[in-house]
């Protein structure tokens, strides 16, 4: 009877994951495919979030087991760095770049800036503060793709990370900002807690998968 109960528990084990929408879209399908091959009896409950701080809040409240997000100031999180994303200026196609391959942060000064929703302003403001820049910010409560479309219609300019703009750049021009600005993406678990074997195996899949990103452009 105990053996049957143990088998049942193993079959119904679930890992709860909270991930940024961009990570859930572009990373998680391959990661979960690899994980399922080595842990077929472990279920995964994937929750997609659009707010930069929400994964950390869910982890802190015990509502998720693993998070995929950008590094934030949360002391109760065991953090594993995975990838450094470049930040890009999002500009209308007709913006006068004059053959430049980078966009100076100083050039955001005084321009109409469409601030992506979901507290991505944390990363934007960090870049602006280093450069001493003050843009004319307008927060827009729409998804990243809509912000990009708005830029394409000449309603302002913006700044986003690599994964945020992936596959949505036909109507705009995207160039890295200068000086180079990054946000660190990583995996987080509860601090000071021994990870179950299933989560350790998931972590191995994640680390192995993201190793292939070094030097790759999205």
Segments (PLM) and residue ranges:
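Central regulatory/effector-binding core of bacterial HTH transcription factors
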Residues: 12-74, 141
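A late-sequence structural motif
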Residues: 173-218
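Hydrophobic hinge/microswitch elements
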Residues: 50-55, 60-63, 119-173
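Alpha-helical linker/hinge and terminal dimerization helices associated
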Residues: 1-8, 206
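Short beta-strand->loop
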Residues: 78-88, 139, 162-163, 170-184
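Flexible hinge/capping segments at coil-to-helix
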Residues: 8-9, 76-87, 91-113, 196-197
């Amino acid at each position: 009877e105990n053996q049957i109960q143990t088998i049942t528990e193993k079959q119904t084990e679930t890992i709860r994951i909270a991930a940024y929408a961009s990570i859930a879209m572009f990373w998680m399908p391959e990661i979960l495919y690899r994980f399922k091959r080595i842990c077929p009896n472990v279920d995964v409950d994937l929750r997609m979030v659009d707010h930069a701080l929400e994964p950390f809040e869910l982890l802190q409240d015990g509502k998720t087991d693993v998070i995929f997000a950008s590094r934030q100031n949360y002391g109760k999180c065991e953090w594993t760095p995975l990838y450094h994303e470049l930040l890009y200026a999002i500009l209308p196609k007709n913006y006068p770049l004059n053959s430049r391959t980078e966009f100076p942060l100083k050039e955001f000064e005084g321009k109409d800036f469409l601030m992506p929703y979901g507290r991505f302003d944390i990363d934007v403001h960090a870049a602006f503060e280093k450069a001493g820049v003050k843009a004319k910010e307008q927060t827009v409560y729409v998804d990243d793709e809509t912000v990009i479309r708005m830029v394409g219609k000449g309603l302002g300019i913006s700044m986003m990370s690599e994964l945020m703009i992936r596959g949505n750049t036909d109507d705009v021009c995207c160039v890295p900002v200068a000086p180079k600005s990054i946000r660190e993406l990583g995996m987080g678990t509860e601090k000071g807690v021994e990870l179950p074997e299933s989560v350790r195996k998931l972590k191995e899949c994640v680390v192995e998968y993201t190793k292939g990103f070094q030097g790759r452009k999205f």
